[in-house]
Amino acid sequence: MNKNYDFSYTQDRELSWLKFNERVLREADKKNVPIFERLKFLEIFTNNLDEFFMVRVGSIHEMSLIHDNHRDIRSDLTPEEQLDEIAKHVRPLYELRDKIFAKVSRELADKKIKRCQIEELEKEEKKKLKTYYEAMILPVLSPIVIGKQHPFPHIPNKVLQIGLILKKKEKISFGIIGLPKDVERMIFLPGEGRSYVLLEDIILYFCDELFENYTVEEKAVLCITRSADINPDDEIYESTDDYRTHMKKIIKMRARLKPVRLEIEGNRHKEIKKYLSERLNISEQDIFKSQAPLDLKYVYKLTDKVSKEERKNGCYRPFVPALNRDFIPGVSVTKQILEEDKLLSFPFDSMDTFIELLKESAKDKETLSIKITIYRLARQARIVKYLCEAAENGKEVLVLMELRARFDEENNINYSEILEEAGCKVMYGMEDYKVHSKVCLITKKNSRGIYYITQIGTGNYNESTSKLYTDLSFMTASEEIGHDASVFFHNMATFNLQGTYEHLLVAPSSLQDGIIKRIEREKMKAESFQPCGIFMKMNSLTDRKIIDELSKASNAGVPIFLLIRGICCIRPGIPGKTENIRVESIVGRFLEHSRIYAFGVGDDTEIYISSADMMTRNTRRRVEVAAPIYDPRLKQRILKMINVMKQDNIQAQVLLSNGEYTTKKKREDNMNSQIHFLNEAKRLAPKEKTQKQNLFYQVKGIFFGKKKLRKK
């Protein structure tokens, strides 16, 4: 046991994450969630679990080989013990997914939307299906029987396969068929209903004839999950390569990493499981059976086959992000930011406002440079368009593009090439430190001198996810914040991770210490009987130093409210340890993604928004930025948002001291915070500007120059 830590109020990060994913799964079992959205929650749960095995389980497997006696500082478990616990907790989740999928499928069948088993079809339907199979599927299949002339093939990560146990003259062989990529996954049957069969079911049903010299003893749909845990900075870097070329090689390497999970659909697969376990060196605890399809991505296309009325009743009501309440349509975004600080709240506010800022800056004669950090982008990114346009217009454009953003590497590599071709200067992050911060600095010059527009956000510059994730985007013309941002980009360009800043908290140099300093300040207030309090909203909490400081503050009497969507390694309500800490989690229509850190009470509250969770990887091993909110108006807006989220008793759940979550009591004035913000954004969205407003900005806005910081 590790005697350096107190484990009485902490828990394992992997098991905490599995609890989060269970909350996602249980959204699919809620009657008040529209039927097609319940299907999507099933797919989100499945995709989350896939990535968990690729990243976390893959990493722990490697750890077990290298540091088998290492003990986790939050749970005191060794890697082997963690893997055992993960398997023990994941198996019931498969069973729960099967149960919920079957339930949702029955409800859809009542609406004549049904996944059919071929055995159930009428003779004529089977005949038509076979005709389709022979014409469209059979020509693109590549069946293999493993033998001396056909060695065991590489099975790609997360690609469905048909595995078969074949018998010929008492000799047992193994056959495998990969699902073709370019064939529709759902094949709809003729008729008025929306009955369909899945591609893998068709191949499974008709594939016996592909092995006519054999007797098929067993056959099943299966899927291999491979580790994606590969650190580009740990691999051999050839001096003749640029970093982009190096990353392309890394992506290819990932495809061939060690299998960490085998999934098999159905029940008849005893010999298949035994054979693959030996060939792939996968232990029994890493093999999972499922009654639900192993890949649920097809569910997103189901709504294409239903009527407008069915879509209306079966999906969330379509929502178009509103224009932000603080902006007047038709008036220069730049001029409005020069007048006062602005805050966008996604997905309720539109990201178009920020894109318009880039568009204006790309054309503005006063713009000298645009500097931006990019972690993830949409597949079709207008942000890139305007950065390229700025460079082509003679502006200096510096893009710090993080090529190591997991599973977005190829997209970022492609965009880095486009940006370079347009004349942008592109940097590829920092060695050993991912650049995860969200900072954009626009430097301008007029007759009065240099001035800045700075944007700092909690989420990515991704126009797609900005409609699905809750995030904050802060925009200011503060000279002091702009100067800090300018120092930040200078430090990044010169590989200086230990720079000093007057206002921003920047990891790895000052973020962790800055947060701890503010926790300690609230602790000192409590000890001297002054009003105090801490609110933290984040995706995950794993940083052991932060956890221990929160425990100390709790013991001193500081009321602490933690709103943590995912991993939470602190257990609240432990007497003498965390009894003044309350932890809640909101899981709903939108993915909670904003990070807000508030210290103090009332008008004296100090508020930061950040790209960083309180995870050691963020506070010590990444480049992150937290920005202070000084404007009293914006502070009050964020404090109101915090109060609404605290009142949420529909989507919020409470973490108990034993690590389990429970629902909150219902009231007469029930609160769903996401719906509240959605309706509020619609209600407060600005109308077209009046002639009076337009004249005001024409006269006043043109004279805006350098702007001093509005302090608390």
Regions found by a protein language model. Name each.
Residues 544-547, 551:
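Glycine/threonine-rich ATP-lid/beta-loop region of ATP-binding domains
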Residues 1-534, 552-556, 568-712:
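N-terminal localization/anchoring segments of enzymes in phospholipid and broader phosphate metabolism
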Residues 559-563:
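Hydrophobic alpha/beta core scaffold segments
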